[in-house]
Amino acid sequence: MSLAVVILAAGKGSRMNSNKPKVLQTLTGKTLIRHVLSRVEPLNPDNIIVVTGHLKEMVEADLADKKVTFVEQKEQLGTGHAVLQALPYIKEDKVLILYGDVPLISTDVLANLIKSASDDLAVLTAIVDNPTGLGRIIRDKFGAVSHIVEEKDATDGQRQIKEINTGMYCVAKSHLDDWLPNLGNTNAQGEYYLTDIVAMARGDNISITVTHPVEEFEIQGVNDRIQLAQLEREWQKHIAEVIMSKGVSVADPSRIDVRGKLEVGKDCWLDINVIIKGHVKLGNNVVIGANCILKNCTIEDNVKIKANSMVDGSIIREGAIVGPFARVRPECDVKEGAVIGNFVEAKKTILGRGSKASHLTYLGDSEIGANCNIGAGVITCNYDGVNKHKTTIGDYAFIGSDSQLIAPVNIGSGATIGAGSTIVSDVPADNLAISRARQRHIDTWQRPVKK
């Protein structure tokens, strides 16, 4: 059977007190609506419809790279009315209905909901400790679902019910064609509730199947920044537990932030306040110090990233050491056993096997061979104000402290650069190059005297 997915994303989210629509608030570094799409796309639906409303242009811009159809709900008249706007654009047999502000529903739970629907109606419900504000599932004396009542319309007795409606359904398109045009708005909100299709299904003797999420956070919606922060911590705790189960030690599971995809080896150690962005791969026995940021990088076995360091878009090879207070910018390849030390910045640089830049250095657009020593304060001067230029350093070279290498320049293997030199031309292999003013001693000099 063909499948359409309808994602409701028209709400204002006034409690966010924001200039952005609610679905564009971010969780783990990604907008809420993109979280929902990332969980839907593996289902390979034939059609994805996003119902927009408040600041629709911003939502459309955020999803410009996605293959979706946008449908506008011009008036906010309820969830049933929102799905009704999408109905003319649905040609598929089944319809999965989701919410753009419920970001963490898992693909597996959705797949089970779709499977359970068969040709009829499947409802995702959950039993929660605190159902306040949520629609309650009303069952008959035989335990079958009869209808859903919203909190504002519920009696005191119904408000004691712990089973709640998540708002997620999978239903045959033919049933929506029958039910949605007949929704009423005689309720406390004066809105057209999508929840009323459950009672309609019951009235038409349509089978109603109930499925449940695995984790409660999967069905948690976001209405304000407090809930957003709480859900962020719930999700980060879940991620921490997952990576710990794979053999990673986390110093404090409440102080880790994974804002992308993290692949881990065994026996790694993550200290407090580590932030992961994009796609990060960690090998075995990797140590990440406190307050580090890793983004779109590969960290191989036995690497140490010391405290307060950043690695972005680069690869750190086996046994290398980075930091503390180091910054590895995109397109770097730090080879096996190499060292990027404290207050060293590297950009688009290959640092060869066993080479060391231990302190206070800038390496940009550089290719450095094996077993080199880069002294403190060395600068590769790669930018002429318009273009970037390359510095090449051969194996076993020694670059003395406080030297400037004016690119483009080649330093031969085994060459030595005297401390404090400014190198403007190529240095042959095994040569000493020194470029600095001759030291003078003036024994007749006297300090000035204050008058």
UniProtKB/Swiss-Prot annotation:
Its cofactor is Mg(2+). It catalyses: alpha-D-glucosamine 1-phosphate + acetyl-CoA = N-acetyl-alpha-D-glucosamine 1-phosphate + CoA + H(+); N-acetyl-alpha-D-glucosamine 1-phosphate + UTP + H(+) = UDP-N-acetyl-alpha-D-glucosamine + diphosphate. GO terms for molecular function: glucosamine-1-phosphate N-acetyltransferase activity; magnesium ion binding; UDP-N-acetylglucosamine diphosphorylase activity. Gene3D superfamilies: Hexapeptide repeat proteins (2.160.10.10), Spore Coat Polysaccharide Biosynthesis Protein SpsA, Chain A (3.90.550.10). The keyword Acyltransferase applies. It comes from the Bacteria. Residues 247-451 are annotated as: N-acetyltransferase. Residues 1-225 are annotated as: Pyrophosphorylase. Keywords: Acyltransferase, Cell shape, Cell wall biogenesis/degradation, Cytoplasm, Magnesium, Metal-binding, Multifunctional enzyme, Nucleotidyltransferase, Peptidoglycan synthesis, Repeat, Transferase. Residues 226-246 are annotated as: Linker. Signal peptide: none annotated. It is found in: Cytoplasm. UDP-N-acetyl-alpha-D-glucosamine binds at residues 8-11, 22, 73, 78-79, 99-101, 135, 150, 165, 223, 329, 347, 362, 373. The active site is at residue 359. Its EC number is 2.7.7.23, 2.3.1.157. It holds the Pfam family Hexapep. Binds 1 Mg(2+) ion per subunit. InterPro entries: Bifunctional_GlmU, GlmU-like, GlmU_C_LbH, Hexapep, Hexapep_transf_CS, MobA-like_NTP_Trfase, Nucleotide-diphossugar_trans, Trimer_LpxA-like_sf. One of its GO terms (cellular component) is membrane. Mg(2+) binds at residues 101, 223. Acetyl-CoA binds at residues 376, 382-383, 401, 419, 436. In the N-terminal section; belongs to the N-acetylglucosamine-1-phosphate uridyltransferase family. In the C-terminal section; belongs to the transferase hexapeptide repeat family. HAMAP family: GlmU. Catalyzes the last two sequential reactions in the de novo biosynthetic pathway for UDP-N-acetylglucosamine (UDP-GlcNAc). The C-terminal domain catalyzes the transfer of acetyl group from acetyl coenzyme A to glucosamine-1-phosphate (GlcN-1-P) to produce N-acetylglucosamine-1-phosphate (GlcNAc-1-P), which is converted into UDP-GlcNAc by the transfer of uridine 5-monophosphate (from uridine 5-triphosphate), a reaction catalyzed by the N-terminal domain. Homotrimer. This is Bifunctional protein GlmU.
